[in-house]
């Protein structure tokens, strides 16, 4: 950071298709007399695809305030699956292209003293539509797969010592695709 430029941090993340993908997991009704409730036959432990995320974060200090902003783009790689159907007894091979995601956020942190800081920020993640294509068939857009998950975030950080920090936060969903509220407490350790 200098008089003309903020601190700029570049990031890059790779997501591998490990675990069980969500595609092809069959749904069933645990109670044959009640078809209002369906449950998956097993739970996914991954997203089933390769994804690459590149981002930039900007930080500017105006003591005792720090302004920050970030932007990131996630590219999801298309992948073919032997079965994407959720219907028991049905197999539907298809190529799936999850929608790419643009993430934007900005906020500020206020240092109350040398150990405590408050923060407020706004963030949004906009996902384009997911597309599927059956072998030899046309590419179709999955209805309702475009999302915008926006949230207003409040946090407090307290440095216990030079290694341990306590981070408490409350996130309020600002769009239908975001969780209504997320409340959390973290204890990051720095080596």
Q: Where on the chain are the PLM-derived regions?
A:
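Outer-membrane beta-barrel channels and translocator barrels
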Residues: 1-5, 17, 62-65, 113-115, ...
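Short, surface-exposed, charged loop/turn segments at secondary-structure junctions
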Residues: 26-33, 72-75, 82-89
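Hydrophobic, aromatic-enriched interface-forming segments
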Residues: 46-84
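Transmembrane beta-barrel strands of outer-membrane/channel proteins
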Residues: 10-16, 54, 69-75, 120-124, ...
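Outer membrane beta-barrel transmembrane domains
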Residues: 80-191
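Solvent-exposed loop and beta-edge segments used for protein-protein assembly and interaction
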Residues: 2-6, 48, 61, 98, ...
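Hydrophobic alpha-helical segments and helix pairs
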Residues: 1-50
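Transmembrane beta-barrel wall of Gram-negative outer-membrane proteins
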Residues: 1, 57-59, 105-107
């Amino acid at each position: 950071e200098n008089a003309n430029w903020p601190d700029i941090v570049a990031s890059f993340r790779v997501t591998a298709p490990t675990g069980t993908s969500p595609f092809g997991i069959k749904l069933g009704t645990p109670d044959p007399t009640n078809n209002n409730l369906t449950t998956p036959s097993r739970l996914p432990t991954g997203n089933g695809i390769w994804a690459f995320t590149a981002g930039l974060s900007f930080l500017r200090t105006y003591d005792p305030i720090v302004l920050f902003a970030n932007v990131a783009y996630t590219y999801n790689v298309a992948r073919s699956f032997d079965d994407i159907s959720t219907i028991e007894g049905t197999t539907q091979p298809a190529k799936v292209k999850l929608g790419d995601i643009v993430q934007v956020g900005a906020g500020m942190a206020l240092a109350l003293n040398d150990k405590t800081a408050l923060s407020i920020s706004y963030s949004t993640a906009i996902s384009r539509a997911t597309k599927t294509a059956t072998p030899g068939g046309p590419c179709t857009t999955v209805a309702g797969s475009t999302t915008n998950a926006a949230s207003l975030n409040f946090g407090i950080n307290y440095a216990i010592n030079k290694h341990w920090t306590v981070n408490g936060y409350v996130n309020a969903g600002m769009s239908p695709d975001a969780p209504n509220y997320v409340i959390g407490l973290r204890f990051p350790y720095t080596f």
